[in-house]
């Protein structure tokens, strides 16, 4: 069974979803891929997993590094799971490029190289935004591209984490936003 709750964050309303194992989704209302993978049958109810996720978000939006993860249970391919596991290793307030992420994944898998676009595709289909920190992945040279919650939110999330914002720029309309 899937359970849902809403969370009113400073950057907009968030839909949280969980099953008995862990958090399965966290989406900003109106985001690209909103509620992607959410079963048609779900119940709005408090669960220990959703309570932990809300506690994590409370700390995060208060400007603190939470220091723990709620139980996570993202559904995805083996490749997506590998990319999402790497996202969880990006430190609070730090960023990596899509190319760096692809190189890390290739190294872990014993491959000579990996496509940054392939890694970016998995990053873009992360169903547990913020907690699995896809907003910490940036384009080459600091280009802030590719956040399903919107570039404005990506900027605000990185600023909240006190990332060095002088290194980043928002590309012109029409370039991989």
Put a short name on every predicted segment.
Residues 5-10, 64-177:
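Nucleic acid-binding interface residues in structured DNA/RNA-binding domains
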Residues 1-24:
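DNA-contacting interfaces and partner/effector-binding or oligomerization modules
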Residues 15-16, 25, 97, 146:
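A sequence-level detector of short linear motifs
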Residues 18-69:
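Compact structured core domains
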């Amino acid at each position: 069974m899937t359970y849902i709750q809403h969370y009113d964050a400073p950057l907009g309303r968030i839909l949280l979803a969980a099953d008995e194992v862990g958090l399965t989704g966290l989406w900003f209302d109106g985001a690209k891929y909103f509620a992607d993978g959410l079963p048609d049958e779900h119940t709005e109810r408090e669960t220990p997993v959703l309570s932990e996720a809300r506690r994590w978000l409370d700390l995060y939006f208060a400007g603190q590094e939470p220091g723990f993860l709620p139980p996570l249970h993202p559904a995805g391919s083996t490749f997506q799971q590998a990319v999402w596991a790497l996202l969880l290793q990006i430190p609070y307030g730090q960023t990596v490029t899509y190319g760096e992420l692809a190189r890390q994944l290739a190294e872990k898998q014993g491959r000579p190289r990996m496509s940054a676009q392939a890694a970016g595709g998995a990053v873009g289909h992360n169903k547990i935004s913020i907690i699995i920190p896809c907003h910490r992945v940036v384009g080459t040279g600091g280009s802030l591209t590719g956040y399903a919650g919107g570039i404005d939110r990506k900027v605000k999330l990185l600023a909240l984490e006190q990332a060095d914002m002088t290194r980043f720029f928002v590309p012109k309309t029409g370039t991989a936003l």
